[in-house]
Structure formats: structure tokens, C-alpha cells
């Protein structure tokens, strides 16, 4: 196959895939800004890269996710599911190897019992 040029995938695009994959995972109710001290006004952000940091080196990419999990779910199971989902979706959509997905649980959301 003749090579016609290069393909560049931005960190923003990769972060958006990671963000959406995490939000679609059972038990995740939102992503928090990585710098939690920025205040509660950005606690549940809908910005498609908030709470996601992408790092790249010669061996692939790593992703840090800062998630809010639903109270009552098994935190370790939710985090593991998020990790697998994010890795699978990034690799299948971009073809870029993901060497690590680090899930940081920033808080729990307690649902109203009404």
C-alpha cells in the first residue's frame, strides 16, 4: 500500500476517547479535575478532557483518570473496569499502544434516597 502522508492524533482526541469510555463505565458518575483544590464548581465537569491527562513516550501512551464513583459500588472493580475499557477503546480507535491507565478515585457520590 502506498503511503500518502502522516496521521497525527492529538492528545485532546485521545483524552476525549478516555473521558467518554470512563463515563460509560458502570459505577462512574463523573470525572474530576486532577487538581481537586480548584474548587467544587468544576467537580463534575462535562468538558471532554477534564479529569484526563495523557502522557506519551517511545513505548506508547499512559493515561491518568480522576474519577467520581457511585457510593455503594465496589471501587476496585469499577476502577479495573474503567482501566480495561479506556485501554481497549483507545487502542481500537487509534492503533496506538496504551502502556498504562491509572485510575485515581477522587470521590464518591451518594445518590438521594427519595
Q: What do the PLM-derived regions correspond to, one by one?
A:
Residues 75-94:
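Short, non-transmembrane amphipathic alpha-helical segments
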Residues 1-71, 80, 96-108, 112-114:
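Contiguous, often N-terminal, cationic amphipathic patches that form binding interfaces
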